[in-house]
């Protein structure tokens, strides 16, 4: 919503910022094993779904985006007071995670990550942590 209200100032979602400004300055070393990625509703609305998935693919050997899961149902902070919405929205997540052998999940919204962690059986954290774990600064970023 902020992007819609503020016209002159460009705001970046974290994965978008990394993809746009840091990707060429970092050396990526993909980590072994599959990771899960949850594309948030706001990323879909902004047309950035591919950005977080592409970023994760630079960082991991295998990226799992559970097709059975769209919205996580946390709805900002509503999941704290209505956890049944989150439970229903993510009812198909755990089997996908277990089948694929995923040990960690990544997203870009802390409240989504809380619900995803509770329902999947694996920790979900910001995609920024995955990027930090799999990158080092390039010696000559302009080269």
Predicted regions and their residues:
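Iron-sulfur cluster-binding electron-transfer modules in prokaryotic oxidoreductases
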Residues: 1-143
């Amino acid at each position: 919503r902020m992007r819609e209200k503020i016209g002159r100032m460009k705001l970046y979602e974290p994965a978008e910022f990394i993809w746009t400004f840091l990707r060429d300055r970092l050396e990526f070393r993909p980590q072994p094993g599959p990771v899960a990625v949850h594309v948030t509703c706001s990323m879909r609305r902004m047309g950035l779904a591919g950005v977080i998935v592409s970023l994760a693919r630079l960082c991991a050997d295998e990226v799992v985006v559970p097709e059975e899961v769209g919205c996580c149902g946390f709805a900002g902070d509503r999941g704290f007071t209505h956890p049944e919405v989150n439970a229903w929205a993510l009812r198909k997540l755990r089997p996908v995670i277990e089948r694929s052998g995923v040990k960690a999940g990544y997203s870009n919204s802390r409240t989504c990550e809380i619900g995803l962690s509770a329902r999947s059986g694996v920790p979900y954290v910001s995609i920024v942590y995955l990027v930090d774990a799999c990158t080092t600064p390039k010696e000559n970023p302009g080269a």
